[in-house]
Amino acid sequence: MFGNLLTKMFGSRNDRLLKQMSKEVTKINALEPVLEALSDEELKAKTTEFKERFTQGETVEQLLVEAFAVVREASKRVFGMRHFDVQMIGGMVLNEGKIAEMRTGEGKTLTATLPSYLNALTDKGVHVITVNDYLATRDADWSRPLFEFLGLTVGCNVAGMTTQDKQAAYQSDITYGTNNEFGFDYLRDNMVFSPQERSQKPLHFAIIDEVDSILIDEARTPLIISGQAEDSSALYKIINTLVPTLEQQEEEDKEGEESTGDFTIDEKAKQVYLTERGQIHIEEIMVEKELLTAGDTLFSAANITLLHHVMAALRAHKLFQKDVDYIVKDDEIVIVDEHTGRTMEGRRWSEGLHQAVEAKEGVNIQNENQTLASITFQNYFRIYEKLSGMTGTADTEAFEFNHIYGLETVIIPTNQPMVRKDLSDLIYLTTEEKFEAILADIQDCVKRGQPVLVGTIAIETSEFLSDFLKKAKIKHKVLNAKFHQQEAEIVADAGKENAVTIATNMAGRGTDIVLGGNLDATIAKLTNPSEDDIAKAKAQWKIDHERVLELGGLHIVATERHESRRIDNQLRGRSGRQGDEGSTRFYLSMEDSLMRIFASERISNMMRKLGMEKGEAIEHPWVTRSIENAQRKVEGRNFDMRKQLLEYDDVANDQRGVIYEQRNELLDNEEIGSVVEAIRSDVINGVIDQHIPRQSLDEMWDIEGLEEQLKGEYATELTIAKWLEDDSKLHEESLREKIITEFEQAYKDKEEAVGVDVLRQFEKAVMLQSLDSHWKEHLSAMDHLRQGIGLRAHAQKNPKQEFKRESFELFTEMLDNLKYDVVGILSKVQIRAESDVEAVEEQHRKSEEVPMDFQHQSASSPSEQAQTPRVGRNEPCPCGSGKKYKQCHGKLA
């Protein structure tokens, strides 16, 4: 109550920020007549003046008023477009490292030019990040004339570019690109072999367009660079034949009763679980197929791989649907993004799930992947010194933006008042009744000529609805993941009179639906148009635009509610841009997945008891409240999942930071002799400690073992036993010093034999090779630890604490193993000439240049391992040498 009273008295924080920024806008507007009087050359010279003032100590904030005024004046001259006052406020919000919520059609692309220009004056680079290559290229091409007029360069960073092209893009003052590509470039830069191969500069300032899509929707799934592991396609095919023989259990087990089915499905968590009966059933079949020996169990450590295969196949068959979660195209499984409805060419689900779906659909099974590098968007974007974003719908997720990223959301008022009519939801008992009502609404719009956009959640629904409209002889266009090549053309026509467009969630997001059709697209279709042709096209567009406004603008028909209110609001936002007329209506049924899984059964029973007739809809506050509660439940669960992923990835992120920092130091330092010397000291002391424990009795010393290890692993032959015979005064400390001195002398002899420069270069090559090899191995170990850590809860242990503890132990062990391997290789290897060093570097380069997959995929699929039993690093080497695997064939030569 007191909070509301204070808000009434002093205004909300949002109101206060807007009021404060409006004062700055007044100052910017006051400069307009002054800048209008300048020539083009004088206006361009302002950029050089601002840069000089920045180097002399003025801050970006002190330059803001003048810089924004210059961009507005340049935009008037280049585009004939003047930034609105609300766009100026949006630019200030972005410059302060906040999120600007701006409604669809309010000119986010033009708004972004203001903070982009201002922050580019620092020469540290500005990244403008969008959701796909088309939008990145479009926005870069559109803004380039403005920035080049002001003396700045613009680059575009999209998939498939060469290293040289990427470096050129990043050297530009302002770089447009996709979130995936910026993230992958960061990972790739930490896998290069020389500083000259890096693309990115230190990450300074980023503006994220559709920030909710990138930082919320895609944040549950990490970016992964992986290489191919070994082939186990035959096993996938065999397991695939087992799944159809299993029966689903509809009800939960009751205490004391046996399972009635082989597996259960949890639709909320999107998981499948084997019952005890299912486990026995599968084990019997596997014994028949000779995958298991009689009496063996699926849950033993040796068979954990088989269990992962079974669970992946179960999920593929029971949870992942064709034309909803993926499509089959050109003998390949192509994932469909659940948030946008777009196909994600080249992306693959991780840890065996994709191969299981390939086996299910009978297409070619591609090899599994091994993780080479990975990062989540949360941790990538938190590297930037300053981060900001724009979207039409951020307010519902404002808490998460603040909690995870420390980003405040500011709601920017619209330039024109919003007049769109958001009609109340209509709820039907069955899907059939719902679609009949949708058809009636579309027919009414068609009769009057009002354009209508029908929003669906899945490709399957859009195709079903398309068939439905064909039977009713209604002309329409379909915009979904299967046809997004024609996306721009379909969106350009969606606002025309009589247009009926069916679209999945993507709904041409990032492209405005203009009432009366897109004028620029119409002019682009003309062949060598004259001034007269363009004038005629503009006049005709004006007539068409006014006509559609008279009809009520764009009408949005939504076929069901999405699990996130934000996605629903995005669909609504397609209509009513810049003060245009428009209307929206959601049609729901009690059979919709959201209602079926989350809405109360009481509502369904209530609707039946009301004795509703077929085709009759219900509009009731109870039902609306129940739907909103259902959406909040899902949003809350998804937030928890993202938060949990971040908590786990924060552990890996600290380790990643250490490794990448060490790697970059290795790359940047010409001479790493002192680093190797410190490592040698650690290793030789560690080896001595194993055989001559500190402050121990002579009887506890293992001199023979020490001599053998030094000779076998470090090619250093020392007669320590003879030293002790010859000198009775040698004690623990003096003996240690003598061993270290002789060990160092042997290395100095090698240095003199091959030359200091050659050895330093070789040290660097070996360090990089060993670091990369151990880090990849560590990532794999972390993946496996992460997949199984949830089971610790059964032992009354906190999985997160256990993960932190064990991952730290793994990391410490990895760093120790790295040191021992590096010293072992450097001690044993015989270097004859500089060509030997080049050969090692080339071998490392080739080992890294395997075909790589760049994935942004599910982090929650079941774990998958290669079929061949993995030899533990501390187990005896299979070659029979008697040494540990890590000290024999487990080591990279």
Swiss-Prot record:
Its main location: membrane. Coiled coil: none annotated. Its cofactor is Zn(2+). ATP binds at Q87, G105, E106, G107, K108, T109, D512. Its EC number is 7.4.2.8. Residues 855-868 have a biased composition (Polar residues). GO terms for cellular component: cell envelope Sec protein transport complex; cytosol; plasma membrane. GO terms for biological process: intracellular protein transmembrane transport; protein import; protein targeting; protein transport by the Sec complex. It catalyses: ATP + H2O + cellular proteinSide 1 = ADP + phosphate + cellular proteinSide 2. It is an enzyme of class 7 (translocase). May bind 1 zinc ion per subunit. Keywords: ATP-binding, Cell inner membrane, Cell membrane, Cytoplasm, Membrane, Metal-binding, Nucleotide-binding, Protein transport, Translocase, Translocation, Transport, Zinc. InterPro entries: Helicase_ATP-bd (IPR014001), Helicase_C-like (IPR001650), P-loop_NTPase (IPR027417), SEC_C_motif (IPR004027), SecA (IPR000185), SecA_CS (IPR020937), SecA_DEAD (IPR011115), SecA_motor_DEAD (IPR014018). Zn(2+) binds at C877, C879, C888, H889. This is Protein translocase subunit SecA. It is a peripheral membrane protein. Residues 840-893 are annotated as: Disordered. It comes from Colwellia psychrerythraea (strain 34H / ATCC BAA-681) (Vibrio psychroerythus). SMART domains: SecA_DEAD (SM00957), SecA_PP_bind (SM00958). It comes from the Bacteria. It is found in: Cell inner membrane; Cytoplasm. GO terms for molecular function: ATP binding; metal ion binding; protein-exporting ATPase activity. Residues 840-849 have a biased composition (Basic and acidic residues). Belongs to the SecA family. Monomer and homodimer. Part of the essential Sec protein translocation apparatus which comprises SecA, SecYEG and auxiliary proteins SecDF-YajC and YidC.
